[in-house]
Structure formats: C-alpha cells, structure tokens
Amino acid sequence: MPFTFGQRWISDTESELGLGTVVAMDARTVTLLFPSTGENRLYARSDSPVTRVMFNPGDTITSHEGWQLHIDEVKEENGLLVYVGTRLDTEETNVTLREVLLDSKLVFSKPQDRLFAGQIDRMDRFALRYRARKFQSEQYRMPYSGLRGQRTNLIPHQLNIAHDVGRRHAPRVLLADEVGLGKTIEAGMILHQQLLSGAAERVLIIVPETLQHQWLVEMLRRFNLRFALFDDERYTEAQHDAYNPFETEQLVICSLDFARRNKQRLEHLCDAEWDLLVVDEAHHLVWSTDAPSREYMAIEQLAERVPGVLLLTATPEQLGMESHFARLRLLDPNRFHDFEQFVEEQKNYRPVADAVAMLLAGNKLSNDELNRLGDLIGEQDIEPLLQAANSDRDDAQAARDELVSMLMDRHGTSRVLFRNTRNGVKGFPKRELHTVKLPLPTQYQTAIKVSGIMGARKSAEDRARDMLYPEQIYQEFEGDTGTWWNFDPRVEWLMGYLTSHRSQKVLVICAKATTALQLEQVLREREGIRAAVFHEGMSIIERDRAAAWFAEEDTGAQVLLCSEIGSEGRNFQFASNLVMFDLPFNPDLLEQRIGRLDRIGQAHDIQIHVPYLEKTAQSVLVRWYHEGLDAFEHTCPTGRAIYDSAYASLINYLAAPEETDGFDDLIKSCREQHEALKAQLEQGRDRLLEIHSNGGEKAQQLAQSIEEQDDDTNLIAFAMNLFDIVGINQDDRGDNLIVLTPSDHMLVPDFPGLPEDGCTITFERDVALSREDAQFITWEHPLIRNGLDLILSGDTGSSTISLLKNKALPVGTLLVELVYVVEAQAPKQLQLNRFLPPTPVRMLLDKNGNNLAAQVEFETFNRQLSAVNRHTGSKLVNAVQQDVHAILQLGETQIEKSARALIDNARREADEKLSGELSRLEALRAVNPNIRDDELAAIDSNRQQVLESLNQAGWRLDALRFIVVTHQ
C-alpha cells in the first residue's frame, strides 16, 4: 500500500479508534497515531487491515477546530488530499482543508461513508436489516395494531371494545360487563394499544389491595407490560430519588386505600401527569349527592387531572341508577351533572331500543315505523337508506345494519359505557348444583342452644350470622381444645369427595380464614391430600404462590381452600369443581364465589357442591338461594333487589331456623318477584348498548382476522434469523417450544427483554395459553420490537459487499443495491406511523443508473450472491470508488420521485381519515352530548400537526450493497 506521512486511515477492525494519521514507516511497517484515543498501532505495509479515508464532492467534513466544510473539489498534493469547498459557519467559499487537519473523532454513520472507510458488514446482516425495515413498515400499517400481541383467547366482544376504545384520544369509558366476561382483559388490551401507539406513556392503575399482585402479574404475563407496585415502603424509598415519587416510574399500580389514606400522597398522585387512569371495582366507590365517600372524592380528584379514564365496575342493574350515574359523573362531570335529568334521559331511550329491535327482527317496517326511524336519526338524506332497508334487495341487510349503527352513534351512553351480558355472549358452561344434606351433630346442637341463651340480647342479624357457622359457635365455647372437624359430617364428606376425585382440581370456599386453615391441616394429616390455602392473613406474594401451586397440573395442589376473599378477583377456570363448605350471607357474594370458575374460557360444566347441615341457617339459605332466586345454576341480577326487600323476613328465619312457618310462602313470593324482575330487566335491556358493546358480525370478523395473522410464517423466519445474528442460543424443546439463552458473543451484552437465565418462547397462541412459562412471540412482543430497534437504530448491516456469479454479465460489472427510507419525524403520540411509517424503497442500479429492482426480487437476488471478506472488499471498493460514488449520485436523483409519491399518498390518507373522523363526530355532537369538546379539539389539533409533520417528511440512504460480477 502507498503510505505517506500525514495521510488519514481508519482501522477495519477497530473503527472505534477514529481517524489515524501516518506518523512513521519503514520498508516493512507503518505506524498510525489515533489522536482521539492517543493510541498507536503498528501494521505490516503489505497487508494491513486499514482503509484510506477519502471524501468526495458533495460530502460534509469537520475540521479539528470544529467547523464544517461542504466539499466542492478534491485535490492531491504530494500524496495528501486537500479538500476545497464552502465553510458552513461563515459561508466563505473556496476554503481549503488538508486531510491532516480533519477531526480525529470522525464517526462514519452514513452507509456510503462506512463502505468507503472499510467498515463492511456481513452480507446476512444487510439482508436482516432490509427485512427488518420491510416488516416493521408492514406491521405499522397492519390493522388491529396492539390487539395481536396479547396472550389471550381471541374473544370477539373483548376485541370489539378494545378496538373501539383503544384508538380514541384519551378514552374515558365505563367497562361494566357482567361478571366473568373479562373486564380486566379488555382494560389490558386498551392499555396495550395506547402504549404501543404512543397515545399514552404514563399509566396509573388503582385496585383493591387484594387484587394488586394479580393485576401486576396479569399485565406482565398477558400484555408484557411491566408495572411497578407502589406501597408505603416503595413510596418512602422513591422519595429519595425524586420530589414526586410517582415520577420514578411510567407504569404504576397501587391500592385505593394507599391512594386516599394520605393527603400528600394523593397530591403527588394528582401531580404526576398520568395519561391514563384505570380503576378496578369502581362500584365500591360510595357516592350520594350530599355525602360522597373519601374514596370517591380521591378518584374524582384524579379523574379531573388525568386525560384518559377507564372504570371497571359491576353492571348498571347491580349498581342501581344513582350509583351508575356516579360512575358516569367521574368520566364527564359536565355531561352528567344532574341525576334527575339523567333518569329522564334514560326513559327517553326506549323508543330507540324499540327501533333497534325492529330492525334486528328483519320484518318489513310500516310507514309509521319508517317515519319514526327517520325522526330518531334526523338526517335529510336518509330516505334511500330507509327504502333499501325495507326492500327485498340484496343490500337490505347492509342498510339495516347501517341504520342500527347510526342509531347507536346518536343515542344513549354507548360512547362512554360498554356492557356485555351473558345473554349476548355465547360460550359459557352450564352450572349444576349438587346439595348434600347432612345431620346436625349433637355437639353443635348443644352449642347452638347455649349460644341462644347467652346471646338473647343480640340482634336478629348477629344471631343469623352466628347460626350460619356452627363450627365458630362451638369453637368459641371450647377454645383451643375444640376440635369441631372430628365430628362435623361436612369434613368427612369433603375428604370422601376429594379422595374419590384425586385427578380433579377442586376449589373449596368458606367464609372464615380459620376454617380454611383447619381444613388444610385435617386433609393433609388424615388423607395426605395436597391442599393450598388462600386467605386474608397471607401476603400478596404468599397468595400468588398458593394460587400458582394450585394451577400446576402434575405436581400441584389438588384443592385450594379459600376464605371469602378468595372469591373476589381471582380466577381459576382451569378447575370446574366448586365446593361451598358454608354459604355467604348475600347473593352478590354467592355469585362472586361461582364466578371464580364460571368465566369465559371455562371448558367444562361447573359442578357446584353444597354440603349443609339440616335444621340450621345453612338449610334455610340453600333453599332460598336455589328455590327463591335460582342463584346457583344461573346468574342472578335480581338477587340484590330481592335480598333487600326480603331482608327482615329472611334474617328471622336464619336466626331461628327451627321456625319454618311461612318460609315456603317467602320462597314462593321471592321466586315470583325474581321472575317478574327478570322479565322487567329483559324488557328494559338496553339492546342498543348490548349490540354496540358486543360488536356482532364485525367483532367476529375482527377475531378471525387476528387469528389469520397468527399464522404469519414470516415472523418465525425473521425471529430465528434475528436471534442467530444477535447471538442468542436457541434450543428446540419440541411441542412448539424453544428455549432462548444469552451467549458470550452477542451483538450487545444485555439483549432487552431476554432474562439472564433465558426464557421459553412459542409462536402458537394455544401453547402460550396452556403454558404459563412460555412467552407468546408476535410482532408486538418486546423481544421482537427490541430486536428491530437494535438493528435499525444502529448501523448493523448498513454497508456490505457481495459477489454475483453470473456468466450472462461481463466480469467486473458493478451493481449497487440502495435501500432508502422515507420517513417523517414527529412526537410519538401523533401516531404518524399510521400514515407514513419509516418505509424502505429499494433500488438496484447499474453503472448507467438503470433501476433493476422491479425485475429482481430481493430474496431471489440475495440467494444468488456470495460473501466477500472485509479486507478483499475494502480493496474492491477503493479500486472503483469513483464509479460507486457516481452510481450513488444517480440514486439520489431517482429517489425523489418515489419518495414524493409516498409522502403525497400519506398526506392524502391522513387528511381524509382525520378530517372524516372530525366531521363525523362534529355531526354527531349535535345529537349526542356524550361526544366531548376536548376530544374534538384533540382530533383537530392532531390533524393539523400530522399534516405539518408530513409536509416536512424526507428520505435518507439507510443501507447499501456493492456488488461485483464474477464468473468464478
């Protein structure tokens, strides 16, 4: 190699040293000084791994003094390069800069600079980079982004709600599905969409204390969202790191009690600038016009400050009208400010519901009915649609569907309230009751008599509660020596049932924690039955361990013994056998108990076993629940109302179960009331709301589309290619499971999302749902998203050299494959990628500027190429640098047309979509007050910013491949 003192060279193997200067040489060696690090390197002159740094006209270079020069001309004087051009800071022209005075800290980031500097990547990395660009761009444009990556069943009504709400600006909605329909999943899907799109970055979830850890685990396991759990200890600890402890984390879970207990803490929560607030079990927030509870006021303060709010609550029927109004008031106090007015509005929606029922029935409509529809929708140009809906034409059903959609848009609370019922959602199992009447032991009879004498002054309610749990009465008298489990026939029955069903998982629920603990000891000591215990005295982590042990198939516990808290929030639908060792005091708690197994996704009919003692309050209550309310075998939305009306009579029968006169009449009366209320509820069902929440055929198609995307073979091929190149070990374990572990030669020391001890992955949704230890890999999984970022944010694969063996072309023919990226820069929350994601434009240019990309597909072409080692590649590039530079100039002139077309299409699409959305909502605003002014303002502002950002969109060269034709 011809070396001269003062020349600038770069190391092919240690590019981080920056620019080197020739400072010494002899016949065999040359010494380079790298001023940016102060290090010297001695190389053999004949075959040194260094590349001469030479810039070309059009490049911009930096002097050692920091000013920049745009090169117009390159001269050579005595073997040294002199650059002539315009100085950018002073705009002085004809300025010279000798290569020896170049900035030594020069980093080559442009693909062409890296190529000419000898920083040549492996060919497979170039291919991976192009695929990453292509797939990332496609994924940004795929419908249902944010709904495909969660580890959940594809249940249409859940997807429908999440798809509707997740795309909104700062959604403020009430999720009020019946128990077992998956409100937590819906909330998680909405969060996942908002976070993935950039619409939200900071999220606060407030839940009852008993559900904190469950939410933490669900968000991580199902949605790959890592929340931080804040309690007193974590809050105090975080105060050392920031004035506002909640600003130390982006995603936070805390309990309602934690939030409202301390005034300063609540202020910190309010000041933490959350984008989304989620409140679970919101029906526990007590409100009345005169005396709202502290919990309600705490959430109200937060809801006033946080743009997006999701409230998860019981159904409106269970809540009652006033409580339901209180929830809506949290979402939009301006819209829901007058309770009486709200009640009146609800009555006025009946004609709309009737109209929907009319359309859904599919019968021909009378002129009066057509006129009524026209009045309700209130648009001048609706006549053709009405005629089509009432005709025998092929488009009649489509017209009816559109009319239903228009009615839903214009009336009711359907934009702020989502409520699915079991009637409208298929797929629930049957519930079968098995009662077991057992004799009352003499020990209990004696204890009950004594208790009656000693507790004569107790209220009927207290006596009733005592009578439900005779083992507690007995234990109270006998103290520590009382071993009720030795004679209670329910214990013998339970042991017999469990031993005869060893292979089945059984959930046992009892009211008291002490009962659960005592039963565990008896089952373990007498029969060796593996039983986990779950009660309020355990820490959250201990409860999780107990639940996980119960969930294990082979080595797990056969039975989980829960106190009453076990029937709130925890789901065990992998089990189908429920034993109620005793009965809860009200029908809501009964439904909660059954609801732990009776959930969507339950594969078997639920067997409900109730062993009860005759002549006790248990025998009274089991009859009342079953015969009076039908509450065991069906959900009972009327339960609370009937319980309240029959309370006094029921309490008396429970307090004195031997007094049975009139009890049959009470049961008959309650059953009649139940049937009447049920019919009334059915008649008054908000069909409009149910149709909107359920999604119908549209939701079915949504689930089907996502299921089809699950079968994307491109993902598997890309992921394996990515893991290979990053350096992640892959061990195929069979059954569609692969174990990933870090290696010692990874591109980065710590790959984001890959634990130190590795992880198990699967590309199959069914496998992920059955194996909690396996992560479900989709395009939305952090491993894939982080992998894409790792490749595309750096220069991996941005320059390479290949040989093309093709005897149809002359030896030495040059081709340059260019990958440009057309993109726009904008804040993430604008979601610009919907319209113009970073989009690759591939060119394959020959020496004359002919673009062959359309004739030669990338993967086909890539398979015909062979690799060149870096040293040989550098020599090839240096030999034809001027030719390659000329081809690059031709590429720059050709890319503009393609890029402009992409940008113009994106602007047109963005303007049409956002203007259309704004116009639609503005039109609806006149007839539906549930559309918020701030939502309209946000869409308008978003539209203007998106269009402005697209006006400033540009393009850049992202990667290039230099190809030389050979015949060998």
UniProtKB/Swiss-Prot annotation:
Domain of life the protein comes from: Bacteria
Residues spanning the signal sequence: none
Residue window of motif DEAH box: 280-283
SMART domains: DEXDc (SM00487), HELICc (SM00490)
Keywords, alphabetical: Activator, ATP-binding, DNA-binding, Helicase, Hydrolase, Nucleotide-binding, Transcription, Transcription regulation
GO biological process: regulation of DNA-templated transcription
EC number, UniProt record: 3.6.4.-
Reported function: Transcription regulator that activates transcription by stimulating RNA polymerase (RNAP) recycling in case of stress conditions such as supercoiled DNA or high salt concentrations. Probably acts by releasing the RNAP, when it is trapped or immobilized on tightly supercoiled DNA. Does not activate transcription on linear DNA. Probably not involved in DNA repair.
Family: Belongs to the SNF2/RAD54 helicase family. RapA subfamily.
Subunit structure: Interacts with the RNAP. Has a higher affinity for the core RNAP than for the holoenzyme. Its ATPase activity is stimulated by binding to RNAP.
Protein name: RNA polymerase-associated protein RapA
Organism of this sequence: Salmonella paratyphi A (strain AKU_12601)
Taxonomic lineage: Bacteria, Pseudomonadati, Pseudomonadota, Gammaproteobacteria, Enterobacterales
